[in-house]
Amino acid sequence: MALDVLGRLGFFNCGSGSVVTPCSASARLSSELEPSKQRNRSWFRSPGSGGSTWAVANILCFDKDTIPESFRNGRLRSRARQKTLLEGASRSSLSSAARLWISKTAGIPSSRTGCRGSVLNGGWSGGEVAGEGRKSLLPIKRHSSCSSQSLPQQQRRTKDAGRVVCYSHRKRNLGSLLGSRVVEEPWSWILEGYVLKGLTGRRNDGPSELELGRGSYRGGPVHGANHIRPLQRPDSVHPQPLTSARPRRGTEHDELPLRRTLRNCIPHSRDTPPKRDTGIASEKDWGINLKNEKTSESGVNEDGSTWYRESGEDLGDNGYRCRWTVMGGKNADGTSEWKEAWWEKSDWTGYKELGAEKSGKNAQGDTWWETWQEILRQDDWSNLARIEKSAQKQAKSGSGTAGWYEKWWEKYNAKGWSEKGAHKYGRLNDQGWWEKWGEQYDGRGAVLKWTDKWAETDMGTKWGDKWEERFNVGIGTRQGETWHYSATGERWSRTWGEEHFGNGKVHKYGKSTSGESWDSVVEEGTFYQAEPHYGWADAVGNSGQLLSIVALERPPGIYPDLDLGMNKEQQ
């Protein structure tokens, strides 16, 4: 796990003289690392590296022709009092050593440097020792496998060693460094691969070598975590086979130019199943981008896989309009397939809808399906504006022994009322489980929350737990039950309850089938959340694409049929 986290952040070996060498031949991309594992991690111990300690150093690698304007002229133009701790100071060719200014600090992140987690600790093998905040000049040596023939075509023309920039960050964004653009994960800005090679030092029992994976610069952050793994030799790394119907690349070194030329003509597939317990995705996660004209295109990739994409517009009564895009693809033998659809709907009543649906299967027979929707409409009873979000997801293994289904929904209106909930089901071999939960806020202080979970086996054993709470102005109740049924017919249950009077007194009671019982009044404070942590204002702020949908212009003298709205056929 430590190596996975370090692979996303970049690192230096603190126990020995470390050098950074560009090596475009070493490329790996992984998307399994959770963002929550990247936070507040400053120190790790790398297994198999002689017990040396590794410190996190945020690294950005750019090719000469793709360096953003704010990074040019050998200096990082920082704002908001952020400091440059490591910046490229040379554009020499690969045949000569480039140089970096590296800030070496003491053993913990220091407020004097302003760089949280981007620190170097200890002495280098060459005996160079610098105090806290001082800078020392260290060379970047050329790696033996990084000849001009092993570089992508664009870099062969320039023979440039690229640039490396280490910076401090605040709130995990680059907004102060790249103008108004906010990047939630700045560590993913990596163009070319770099190998971090730990030489033998005073605190190393032997040399260790690790590979920093390479992503592709697409004018934005690279998606997916950059994986670090033990490495024997960079030239011994082989590209991993793709299991999807996504168009494949000829060679690893040609990957960057191909992505730049094919990205606009081949649809980017979502050929992986959805993940469980991830709730309702945001507009940004789906990346819906509809075309204004009717199109129909298809193609065959070099590996024999095929793809297609169609776009169009449907019109109906009452100003109904639906703009849509459908795309898909499959591999050469048809064992792997994916489909995806995007749409936006509107009419003269003010109804707006943004949605997406995807499905697929792989060579192992696994299948999946997912749909997502955002809706803006007028409430039928209160005439208030209302935003609704929903998602449904399901996946099933090819063997039929495992599968799951989830339904999520959120509803908000302009007066603070909101409702959220989910239904979940899963099965693995002979065991199945269910979960339902919901919460409702009336916008005036009343709250209802509930949860119901249960599971069972094919042998007849069942167990579960449920609870409910209702509160308003500090007064309310809580009650619940835990139960178990055995395969032999034995039953056990425990029920409990609480009455909160709003004056600091709470009545607690309960009993069980095994003879337990209690009934008492205690002095205890009452806590409950009267307002949702995510409400109407948040829903509006995160629904920019939905709100920007433009309806058809209504002719003069024509008024919307409010009773008709959107009929079932149109929906």
Swiss-Prot record:
UniProt-annotated location(s): Plastid, Chloroplast stroma
UniProt region (Disordered), positions on chain: 142-162, 215-254
Disulphide linkage map: none
UniProt cross-references to InterPro entries, sorted A to Z: Alpha-glucan_binding_chloro
One record GO biological process: starch granule initiation
Alphabetic keyword roster: Chloroplast, Plastid, Transit peptide
Chain intervals with Low complexity compositional bias: 145-155
One Gene Ontology cellular component annotation held by this UniProt entry: chloroplast stroma
Signal sequence interval, chain numbering: none
Family per record: Belongs to the ESV1 family.
Function: Binds preferentially to highly ordered alpha-glucans, such as starch and crystalline maltodextrins. Involved in the organization of the starch granule matrix, thus influencing starch turnover by modulating the accessibility of starch polymers to modifying and degrading enzymes. Required for the control of starch degradation in leaves and starch distribution in nonphotosynthetic parts. Promotes gravitropic responses, negative in shoots but positive in roots, by facilitating starch granules (statoliths) formation in hypocotyls and roots columella.
Protein name: Protein EARLY STARVATION 1, chloroplastic
